[in-house]
Each structure stands twice: as structure tokens, then as C-alpha cells.
Amino acid sequence: MSDVFNSPQARSKISAAFGIKPTAGQDVEELLIPKVWVPPEDPLASPSRLAKFLRENGYKILQPRSLPENEEYETDQILPDLAWMRQIEGPVLKPTLSLPIGDQEYFPKYYPTHRPSKEKPNAYPPDIALLKQMIYLFLQVPEATDNLKDEVTLLTQNIRDKAYGSGTYMGQATRLVAMKEVATGRNPNKDPLKLGYTFESIAQLLDITLPVGPPGEDDKPWVPLTRVPSRMLVLTGDVDGEFEVEDYLPKINLKSSSGLPYVGRTKGETIGEMIAISNQFLRELSALLKQGAGTKGSNKKKLLSMLSDYWYLSCGLLFPKAERYDKSTCCTKTRNKWSAQSSTHLMISMITWPVMSNSPNNVLNIEGCPSLYKFNPFRGGLNRIVEWIMAPDEPKALVYADNIYIVHSNTWYSIDLEKGEANCTRQHMQAAMYYILTRGWSDNGDPMFNQTWATFAMNIAPALVVDSSCLIMNLQIKTYGQGSGNAATFINNHLLSTLVLDQWNLMKQPSPDSEEFKSIEDKLGINFKIERSIDDIRGKLRQLVPLAQPGYLSGGVEPEQPSPTVELDLLGWSATYSKDLGIYVPVLDKERLFCSAAYPKGVENKSLKSKVGIEQAYKVVRYEALRLVGGWNYPLLNKACKNNASAARRHLEAKGFPLDEFLAEWSELSEFGEAFEGFNIKLTVTPESLAELNRPVPPKPPNVNRPVNTGGLKAVSNALKTGRYRNEAGLSGLVLLATARSRLQDAVKAMAEAEKLHKSKPDDPDADWFERSETLSDLLEKADIASKVAHSALVETSDALEAVQSTSVYTPKYPEVKNPQTASHPVVGLHLPAKRATGVQAALLGAGTSRPMGMEAPTRSKNAVKMAKRRQRQKESRQ
């Protein structure tokens, strides 16, 4: 295609079609194609200005806390459990680990990158080539309809009005203040336990809205939650011969930021350090619990002191989320992501991921369940939702994280929690952890967790990610609500939405646009807003059937006119109708689809960026994926994407690049890859491939630990209110005696051995007295072993069950800075003598800090000198 604006006739036709009237000296192309946008200068691009803005808006800035410098230690010394990994081929642990146990301390800093910027305005350029291709195709249609013109107009408007990028410091700060307002403003956050809820009553609501099953499979059960991370990797066999590695660690995005104290590095680059710090934290916690930590007095002080040493576990990096923003709000709206410290992320993921990844339970496969967790709109998923909407019974609701969907009086409501994460309290997360432990980590009534993990989940993890802190520039500031992006974000948000629906049920399900429904905000301290409402929803959906236009899924031809859609905003999806399949099928909401088409994200996978030819491969993936998620329904967008993808394919083939290898893992290159997870589909869009993608299949069978009440959430809400529901006073069916059944296997074996020994040596009055006393001694020894094992199992289980009911949250108090100039003082990089032996160092090495000047260095603390002397004595004793 030559440039569409080269021809005078084309320019005239474009002017007439789009109402463009260039004056003297103006060009049609300049008026239609937006120029490169240069963002304004960021007004808060310095720590002092950012601190002042936050303080003026009542935002809490914390006294800067320092970190010990990282020092190198041999991996085998720190992680002896994983020494075998250093002997196998392939990706293994590094020979050394860098741990925060140095003899100098520093104030950390983190300066996120914001693009586009005034200096780099074209960091993420719009897809002008796609726009020109669509204009060219538009000109080829003799009598183009308004629908086709709207496609070009919508793409042009998105290029003109929006930009893809990561915002500004001003946008981040404004978002922080808005989150604070949600948490503390007109409907301040409230502790659900003070509203009459209990952990168990909330769990029984979640039994309906988020049913879960145990981790692992029937033929491969998961290991109990009783180990440190390094022992979740189990070697079977011999590293010199045949071996297998059983991996019980959670799936983690290793390309994401590692957080403190490894700013600028990824989790994949610091995986050994992540495991080592997690190991030692849990071991120290376990040791303190055995000493009675968590109770009043000195033992509790020891626990708080340990948590103070590990303060960085609760301090996330505040980075800007790259999105497609309105240019007009570039300085006021930037979504923040709270990047959890890697060990924090790992430990919480060890609780949540094994359960949630193995619980494909939702509205599609469980009667009465309103959950959209793991819902996929393809393969008949969206058609099932439309059938649910069309059914006459109402009111009714669906829920996914901070999204609520209600059908009431034949009106569809899409409701979002307002800045959802800001509504969360530590007690909400405690309830979520209680649910995952008692419902997920349960084997026929036996808890699969110990006291250490229960204490971490219930009493420590909530303080690490809710109302904790974050780092931006050299400022350490408070986080209001939960940090967005932590390993429990989804569950916490889903719990908040569940409470909203519970109150709605207790109010006899009023209309969402009523004042009565709005009053739920004040009652719960949870803010929400109606994002979209569609009246006569059933009538509008029925109209899609006769109005469906010929296309890929209605006749197997390329579309000439778009089929109408109903924009449900169902996790971003709309509905249209396929005559060939006889069902409703998903297309991405039109605004979102054309916005995605306007601004490519580019190759986000850093490991792929360096590959030669990856940019052309990305174009193939991008254009075909746009068609798969709904572009196929819009004639100009579909054809333009098809042409541009073909051009990129030809380029790769001409250069001799192995196209199949590039596209084998195409979902890694697509922002929509998650929607196609688990689908074996070809990337080239054809009527056949689209039909295969949308043809209904039976839903996955559910995996639940306990039956779901088919009466739904309404029945459970009412039963809980009247006290008629099962086991309200109990602990979710986790019974101490049932636990003992599984925990006492060793005791049973010991008793069996004693009985076997007794039978093998009958009581013979003529037997030698020495032999008889030996037999008696063996019997007593076996019985003693059985007794001790039984007692230990009962005590450990009792401690675990007691911990999972605890409402305490343990966190040190970190002082606030009143003067913003003090908070933003450029102390970053300033090195100070270490004030203490950190918990990591003491646990790993049994020693405090070491100084280049020797043991008697004047800058050393008394504790450091004491620990160094102890280490020296230990060293001498080994020689």
C-alpha cells in the first residue's frame, strides 16, 4: 500500500468522509493523523516536592529506615538443603548469595521510570500504520456505511486522546492521596469483626462465593504447609544418575521486581536470596513461638524486635502501572502497583497459590456459586452467562475480586469497588487467610499446616501487605489498604465483594441504584460505584440474534458490516451472536479493543527483546490476537490487522527466520495471552479457528473440600443471621481428634511393633530372667515412643488450631516524620555503622556484624562485638 494521502483524489475523499476542512497551508493528513504528543513536565519530579505534596494532603511519611549492605556468602553454606542443585545441569542456583548482613547500613532508594516523558515523548508510539491501512480500506468501499466510518473515527480518537505509558510522579502521588481518602474519608475502613462477623462466618460466605479444594491431585498430593521453602524442592534419585525433582513451590513471575534489598533486580536473578531469607524468617519465627512469643511480656517484645529487623519485608516498591491513559489526566491519574518484597511474595504465595490454582470452581460448574474465578468467556463460557442472565429468576449476582454483577428488574449492573485495595483492613486479610487454611489446607478434617505457618498467615502476613509501607524515590511512606499486586490481592478483594453481597441479601436485595443499596458503603466501610447499567438486558440480548451480520461465525465469510454487541463489561467482555454456532460469543468491549489497537505495548518480555526479528514476530502476534479477541467482528479493523500480520510474516520468511519457533509461545508476546491459556489454537484467524475457539465444551469438574450449598449466598446469609447455619461456633470442621488420626501414624506404628514384639516372645515361666527383662525393656521403650509421639502430635495440632483463630496482628511501630523536608533530605546512599546484628545474620551465621577494623572497632555495637567474639571462639574450637 502506497501512502494513502499521496493522491489528491484520496485526500478529497477523506476530507468529505470525515468532515475535515483544511484551511490554507493545512494538510488533510496533519489534521487527521495526530502529531507526536509531548507530555507536560512532571511537577513532582524531586523528593522534596513529592514529600511536600504528600504532607499537604495529610499523607503519612515514615522515618527513613536503613538496610545493611549486601554481602556474598556461599550458597551451599546458606542453603545446604539445596546443595544438590549445584550438581545438576541446566538452570541452577548461583554459587554465592548476596544477603543483607553487611557491616554498614544505607538508606534505600527507588526511582521508577516514567514514559513517555518530555525528554522521550515517542517512547510508545501509536500504530499509525494500522490507522493508514484502515483509511485505505475505507476508501476502497464504494458506499461505506457509518459503521465503517465509526471504526476509523474511533481509532483516530483513541490515538489523539490517549497514550500508552507509565504516567508521572504527580499521577502516582494523586493516586496515593485518593487511596487514603477511600480508606479514611467519607466511609472509613471498618474491622469486620467489630461489625458482628467472625472468621468462621466470613468463611461460610466464601464457601459459596469462592469454593476451594485441597492443593495437589488425588494421585499426587501436595506436601503439608509445614516446611521452609528450600524443603519444598525434593530430589528423588541420584544426581549422578536418574533423578526427578518434585517442586512444591508456587508459580511466581520471575521477571518481576525482586524488591528490597535488591532494587533493580528481578525475582529470577535473586531466587536463592528469596528462598534463604524466607527460610530464616520462618525458622526464627518458629523458635520464638516455641519460647512463647505472641503472648504478653518479653517474648512478644522479642517477636516485635525480629519483625523490626525484617522491616523491609513489609516495604514494597511503588511503581507506576503502564496503561493506556487519557492524555488530559497524565499528571493526575497513574495507577500504582505495590511490588511486594520477593520473600514476602513467596511466603504468602505458598499459602494461597497451591489452593487457588487447583480450585477451578465457578458459576459454570457449581450450582448456586456466583464466582467468576477462572472463568473464561471462550468455549461457550460467555454463552452460559447469557443463559444465566436470560433465566427469569432474579435478583441474582456474580462476583469476581472487586467486580460485582447484578441482574435486578431486568437491568444489568456492573459494579466496581472504588479503588478496591484501599478498602481492605488487616482483619479482612486475616479472614481470607483463615479461609484458605481451614478450607484449602485441610485433608478430610485434618489441618495440613503447623503453628508457624498459621501464625505467619494470621498474625504477620496481614501486617506485611495491608496498611504497611512503600518506597518511592528516597521516601518511605505508609500504604493505605492493601498493596496492589500482593499474593493475596484477589482473595482479599473477593472477600470484600462477598461482604457487600451478604449485606445486599440481608436487605432483601434492593436495586443497586437505590439509596438503601448505597447505604452498604457506610455500614461496611467499603466504597463502590456503578460502572455500567443496561436496562431491558434480556430484550437487548435477544435482539442480537436477528441482527447478526454475515461474518466469520455467521456464514464463514469476512465481515462487511459489524454485528451488534451488548457491552456487558463482564471482566472487559461484550456479547455478540454467532448464527453458525447458535450461541452468544465474546468480543472485547469496543472501546478497550480499539484503544488496544491504537497503542501497542511492545515486547514486554525482557528475555525476548534481544532476539533478532522479534519486532516483526510481535506484529504478527499482536494483529492476530486483536482479531481473536473481537477484531474479527469489525470489517476494517479485521482486514487491516490481517494485512499487516501477513506483511510481517512475509518479512520474517524473506529474512529466513524460523516463523514457527517465534510463534510457538505466542501468548508470551500478547497482552491477551492469559485469555487463551490452556487452549491449543492456531494463531492465524480463520472461520474454522474461531469456531473451534468458541465451540462449547463441558466445564472442568469442580474441586471442593466441602459441598456447596445449592441455595446460594442468599440462603447462607439468612441462615447465618438467624443462627441456623452449620457449625457456626466450631472451627470449620477441623477437629483435634480427627487431626490426631493422621498425625499419630508414628505412634500407631510404635504400638504395633510393641505388640508384635510381645507376641513373638510369649511369657514363658521357665525363660531366662535376663531375656524376660530385655523383652520388657523393649516393650516399655516402644510404648514410651508411642506416648511421646502421640503427645507431640496433639500439642502441635492444638497449637496450630489455636493460632489459626488468633485475631492479633503483630507489627512494630514505625515513627512518622512531621517535617517533609526532613523526610526528603538526600540521605540516600549515606553509609552508617550497623546498629545491630540483623535477624538474617544471627540466624544464618550465629554471629553479628564484622568490621574491617577488627573485633574492637569503636563503631561496633555491643551486640556486634559480643556476637563476633562468639564466632571467633567457634572458629578456634573447630581448628
UniProtKB/Swiss-Prot annotation:
Keywords: Covalent protein-RNA linkage, GTP-binding, Nucleotide-binding, Nucleotidyltransferase, Phosphoprotein, RNA-directed RNA polymerase, Transferase, Viral RNA replication, Virion
GO molecular function: GTP binding; RNA-directed RNA polymerase activity
Post-translational modification: May exist in multiple phosphorylated forms.
Any one GO cellular component localisation term in the record: virion component
Swiss-Prot/TrEMBL catalytic activity: RNA(n) + a ribonucleoside 5'-triphosphate = RNA(n+1) + diphosphate
Domain of life: Viruses
UniProt enzyme class: transferase
UniProt-annotated location(s): Virion
Catalytic activity, EC: 2.7.7.48
Region entry Disordered, spans: 847-879
Domain RdRp catalytic: 398-598
Protein residues bound to GTP: 259-266
GO biological process terms on file: viral genome replication
Function text: RNA-dependent RNA polymerase which is found both free and covalently attached to the genomic RNA. May also contain guanylyl and methyl transferase activities.
Subunit structure and binding partners: Interacts with VP3 in the cytoplasm.
Protein name: RNA-directed RNA polymerase
Species of the source: Avian infectious bursal disease virus (isolate Chicken/UK/UK661/1989) (IBDV)
Gene name, Swiss-Prot/TrEMBL: VP1
